[in-house]
């Protein structure tokens, strides 16, 4: 026994409306991405048409060609307007679906697998830290060495002055 064609049509229509309700956010995002790509493509075509159009600046032009290009341009603009409305609907629907969700940081969504490169980076960081510590110590030792050299120079100057005074006294005595 077959169902009447009208009943089949209404059953198919109910299935389609149910499927339309069950569209998930990921497929909406894909539809939005395709819509954006269509918008970019149409915009590029509009610029191509505008670039190829000749302005009526005294040069003979064919009115039919001009009207044809103008018609194409207007059709592209209408299509672009429809695509932007479609994109707005997809955007609103995505926001509606995601309204109750809390944003999850992207770091938590990406699984972390420790690999050799992270170990290598840790080793390099440790070596860098050790090298900078060693350099700091060398700079400290150089600073202390300069201070000690200054002190030795002062002592040598004092000894030289003392020896000169002793020699002067001995010379006066003799």
Swiss-Prot record:
The keyword Aminoacyl-tRNA synthetase does not apply. One of its GO terms (biological process) is positive regulation of DNA-templated transcription. GO terms for molecular function: transcription coregulator activity. One of its GO terms (cellular component) is mediator complex. Keywords: Activator, Coiled coil, Nucleus, Transcription, Transcription regulation. Transmembrane segments: none annotated. It is found in: Nucleus. Residues 113-166 form a coiled coil. Its main location: nucleus. Belongs to the Mediator complex subunit 30 family. Component of the Mediator complex, a coactivator involved in the regulated transcription of nearly all RNA polymerase II-dependent genes. Mediator functions as a bridge to convey information from gene-specific regulatory proteins to the basal RNA polymerase II transcription machinery. Mediator is recruited to promoters by direct interactions with regulatory proteins and serves as a scaffold for the assembly of a functional preinitiation complex with RNA polymerase II and the general transcription factors. PANTHER family: MEDIATOR OF RNA POLYMERASE II TRANSCRIPTION SUBUNIT 30. Component of the Mediator complex. This is Mediator of RNA polymerase II transcription subunit 30.
